[in-house]
Amino acid sequence: RACLARRLAGHWPGIDQETAFTLGLFSLLDAFVDIPLKHLCEKLNLSDSLKNALMRRAGGLGQLLTLVQKLEQAEWDDLDWYALEQIGLQADVISSAYVDALNDARELVEALA
């Protein structure tokens, strides 16, 4: 999720790629530590934009996280393709970002092994 968020952010105006990576990473943190995401956001020193994206799917980061989750779950019919194309995220760009993110994640896991 973090790798895909970072890849998509590279095509999303106004969203920093490393912030997007952090967003994707932290969006799954509650599953790893068995603490509700709300409590984690209160304890961690995150920017307001990250907190709002994680808790309410607000702002551009929230929209990005929603997109990443829909892509993960293959909810293609729920995507607003016209809106995505307006910001430069055509289907081929998204497809390439997805494949690149899978490769990034594999390389990351291999580097940690």
Regions found by a protein language model. Name each.
Residues 1-113:
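Metal-dependent nucleotide-binding catalytic modules
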